[in-house]
C-alpha cells in the first residue's frame, strides 16, 4: 500500500476517533482579529519610541553604562554637553516603525490611540470570556496541566505534532501560553504603561516605586513587548503547522469544515497580507501630511486622557519622594546652549554672568514688569528634588532652586480674566520649522492653572549650584506635571495670553509646532 493513502486513512481514523466539535464564536474571532491589528500598531509605534532613546535601565538615574540592554553602539562621554539625548535618536524606515523618520511625536500619538482601542477590545473580550463560560478554555483548573504541557513541549521539540485528541480546543502547552498572555502579560503592559506619565508618577510616586522605579517599569514594558512579539510569531506559525485545516476553518468559519479548508487558507493568508499592508500604509499616510496627522491622532486620545491623566498633577514638592542620595550623577540633556550665530544677545549676557539680564513679564496683566536675577531671588526661593521625565524615555533626578511662577505673576498686578495660558519664550532657537521656514525662537505654553501649581518654578540653580548653560541658565522652567519638552531653557520672557492657538503655529509650543507633540504633555 502506498504511503499517501495510508496517511489519509490514518488521518481519517484519527478524525473519527477525535471528532472536532469545538465552536469558535463570532465574538472570539472578531476580537482576535482586532487584537492582531492593534498589536501591530502598538509594536510598530513602540519601536518608534524606543528609537528615540534606545537604552533601557533599571535605575531612574539613567547613567551611561548602567543600561541592561541598548540598541545602539554609541558610547556616551560623561562631559556635560558632549553628547545629548537628541544625538542618540535613530531614524528608522516607515516599513519598520510607525510612522518612521524620527517622528516620535506622531509615534507616541499612534501608541496612545492604539492603546485606547486595545484596552476597549480587551475589556469586551474578557467580558464575553467570563459571561459565556468560555474562560475554561484558557484558565487551568487542575495541576495535571503541568506534566501534560511538558509532554507537549517535548513533542514539539522532537518536531512531532500532538494528537488532535489533545486539543480541547488547545493542548495543555497552548492553554498555558494563552493564559499567560491574557491574564499575566496583558495586565503587565496595562499597569506599567501609566508609569510613563509624569503626571501619574508625580502625583503617585509610590506607584512607580512599586515596580522599582519608572525605568524598571519601562524595562518591564519592553520585556512585555518582546513576549507579545515572540508569542505572536510562534502562535501564527503553529496555526499553519499543527492541524492547520482545523485551525484555519475555526478562525474563519467558527467550526471545522473539511470542505472549506482551501477557502480558509486563502482568507487567512489574504487577511494577514492586507493587515501588514495596512500597517505600512499607516506610516505613509501619517508622513504625507504631518500636521493633519498630529491633529487627528492627538485629538483621538483626548477622551481617555480626560478620564485619566488629566485628573492628576505633580505633588513631588509636597510628598518629597526623592532625597539628596537619589540625585543623578549624570543627567541627560536634549539641546545645546545657544550659539553666537543663534543668539548673540544670549552670548553677551552669559559673558557677563547674566548681570545685565532682565526677565520680561507681561501680556494680559495690569502691571507688566522686568526683573533681574537678584530681584527674582529676593521675591521668593523654593528648592525641590524632582524626577525629570523625557518623552524619549529617559529620566533624571535633580535638585532645582528658583521662584514659583505663581509668586512671579503676583508681582505684575491683576491677571485679565480672559487670560488662560502662560507663554514662556527662550533665547534658544528651534531645530527646524514645520514648513521649512527659517528657525524661530523656542517657546512653550502652559495652561494658567498648571503654571500656578506648587511644583512649577523658574529655576536659577541646580544641585545647590548656579544653573549651567547646558541646563538652561539664566532661568529654566520646571513644570513637573509635564514631560521635559515643556520645560523650556534659557527663558527670556513670560507672557500671559488668551490661548496658545494665537501664537506660533498655534499648536502650543515649538515641540508641538515642529515636533508634532501635544500641548498636553501629561503622558
Placement of each model-derived feature along the sequence:
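A glycine-rich, hydrophobic loop/mini-helix early in the fold
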Residues: 348-400
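Short acidic (Asp/Glu) patches
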Residues: 99-104, 372-374, 406
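Extracellular-facing segments of soluble proteins and assemblies that are Gly/Ser/Thr-biased and enriched
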Residues: 109, 116-141, 155-158, 387-429
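Short, well-ordered loop/turn elements at secondary-structure boundaries
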Residues: 35-37, 184-185, 223, 354-355, ...
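Extended, aromatic/histidine-rich regions of cofactor-dependent oxidoreductases associated
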Residues: 2-19, 243-352, 359, 411-523
